[in-house]
């Protein structure tokens, strides 16, 4: 749709970027409006949904989306464990949304669930929790990882990764319900998920943490950095600051969730040192050769990312105070 509207705009002499921006804003507002009015109920016969840890931010988001879709939702928090068996006795689905470092422990503590109950977790690591759910429950099991923060406002175009545990035919409707909310689904095995998250989350968050720590130790003047920054540096600085506005326990859990993450970070540290050696030696040609090697590895993605980032930078610059 966007491509055809851009073509029409260009034919009429109207800036295509302007039309695309207006259409995207309309689409965002449409999803936001649905967030207020509600969504279609794909499984009206579903018994109550229990969210374990529903008082947390992601748990509250799923409670909201499920309630807007017409489902009855119950919350099971830490102080409710003495009533846990009663709360889940007739549950049609149980969603575990607790900190990573206690996810497997909480799954293991769950009382027996109805045999047809769908057991779901929302942790950002998948293999351990998925195995824990398969061991704790004989019924349908599904691993989810929402690839966005609970402050997103809307699930429109957000990615939700899913890992099959058991009996996918029983939870297929829930995946479709998530699509009704506007999200995009991506299926992957739990092992592959965790391997990729080592790069997407653990390494990236650690590098951001280290950069923020360096800025703080150097005691730079943030106001001056912002006043002097280019759009791309301002955006990068915003991403660093965003990390430190969130829960440190969450990021400690993500980064330290496996020995594999530590090994990857150590390899990154080693390559950082190798790059510094190029500077110490003043070897510009070696630097350029390494640069070209990485450019070749990125291939067509380099140009694609440049185009995408150009749009983001324009938007960031437009929003500059």
Regions flagged by a language model, labelled:
Residues 27-47, 82-85:
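A short, basic/flexible loop-to-alpha-helix module at the beginning of a structural domain
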Residues 226-301:
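Interdomain hinge/lid region at the active-site interface
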Residues 49-53:
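Conserved N-terminal Rossmann-fold NAD(P)-binding element of oxidoreductases
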């Amino acid at each position: 749709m966007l491509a055809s509207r851009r073509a029409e705009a260009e034919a009429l002499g109207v800036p295509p970027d302007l039309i695309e921006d207006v259409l995207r804003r309309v689409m965002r507002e449409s999803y936001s409006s649905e967030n207020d009015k509600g969504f279609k109920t794909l499984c009206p016969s579903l018994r109550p949904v229990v969210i374990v840890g529903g008082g947390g931010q992601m748990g509250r988001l799923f409670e909201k989306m499920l309630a807007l879709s017409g489902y009855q939702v119950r919350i099971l928090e830490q102080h409710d464990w003495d009533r846990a068996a009663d709360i889940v006795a007739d549950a049609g689905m149980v969603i575990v949304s607790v900190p990573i470092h206690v996810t497997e422990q909480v799954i293991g503590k769950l009382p027996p669930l109805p045999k047809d109950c769908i057991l779901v977790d929302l942790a950002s690591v998948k293999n351990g929790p998925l195995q824990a759910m398969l061991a704790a429950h004989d019924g349908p099991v599904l691993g989810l990882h929402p690839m966005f923060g609970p402050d997103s406002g809307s699930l429109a175009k957000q990615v939700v990764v899913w890992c099959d545990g058991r009996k996918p035919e029983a939870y297929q409707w829930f995946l479709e319900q998530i699509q009704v909310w506007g999200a995009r689904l991506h299926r992957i095995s739990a092992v592959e998920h965790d391997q990729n998250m080592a790069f997407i989350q653990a390494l990236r968050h650690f590098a951001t943490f280290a950069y923020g720590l360096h800025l703080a130790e150097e005691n730079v003047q943030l106001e001056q950095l912002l006043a002097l920054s280019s759009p791309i540096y301002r955006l990068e600085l915003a991403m660093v600051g965003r990390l430190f506005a969130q829960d440190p326990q969450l990021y400690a859990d993500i980064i330290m969730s496996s020995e594999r993450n530590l090994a990857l970070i150590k390899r990154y540290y080693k390559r950082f040192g190798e790059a510094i050696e190029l500077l110490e030696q003043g070897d510009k040609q070696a630097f350029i050769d390494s640069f070209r090697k990485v450019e070749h590895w990125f291939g067509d993605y380099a140009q694609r990312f440049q185009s995408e980032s150009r749009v983001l930078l324009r938007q960031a610059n437009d929003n500059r105070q």
